[in-house]
Amino acid sequence: MGGLISPFVGEMLRGEEKYQIIAVEPASCPSLTRGVYAYDFCDTGKVCPLAKMYTLGSGFIPSANHAGGLRYHGMSSTVSELYDQKLLEARSVEQTEVFRAAQEFARVEGILPAPESSHAIRVAIDEALKCKESGEAKNIVFGLTGTGYFDMVAYQKYNDGEMEDYIPSDEDLKRSIEQLPKMVG
């Protein structure tokens, strides 16, 4: 996402344009919408250096029924800083809605999108429907980062009605966030 939005953020910072930039994440791994902005390990093994990010804690693991990609406990440092500076907003979406949007996109565009991209597709569709209702004309750009051909098992679960949404409890997130490294200084 950082590379796609960089030119637009530059224009915003220079005061040339105003854009609505939306970061979309899974409701089952909501680092921006429910995480904390803190230093954390970039890996679950706690070997990599610490980075400042919105995080659920490096020990956070989404439910086994999470099939929608984007399993990482934290958000990139760049996107985290932009969110902290209120240069972008964040939304979380449930995986059944993500796969519904992905199938709609595949029917219309002939491309089976990766679940990761389908989070953005879900919100792009929602934004387009708002424009249709309000009559507002808006250019909507999203990142299509890959195909869903490696995710056929997840698509099959969705088609068979076996996919469930999972949203971690506040207690689950609190437990994980409490394990963040303690910064001194």
Task: Name every feature range the model reports, one short phrase each.
Residues 3-4, 70, 111, 147-149:
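Gly/Ser/Thr-rich helix-start
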Residues 1-6, 31-33, 117-125, 149-152:
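Short glycine/serine/threonine-rich phosphate/pyrophosphate-binding segments
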Residues 19, 137-138:
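Nucleotide donor/acceptor-binding cores
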Residues 9-13, 129-132:
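A generic local secondary-structure boundary/capping motif
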Residues 112-116:
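Short glycine/threonine-rich catalytic loop with a Thr-x-Gly-x-Asp
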Residues 10-18, 23-111, 157-185:
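Active-site/ligand-binding loops adjacent to catalytic centers
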Residues 95-100, 121-134:
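A short, acidic, amphipathic alpha-helical segment used as a generic capping/interface helix at domain edges
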Residues 23-25, 141-145:
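Short beta-strand segments
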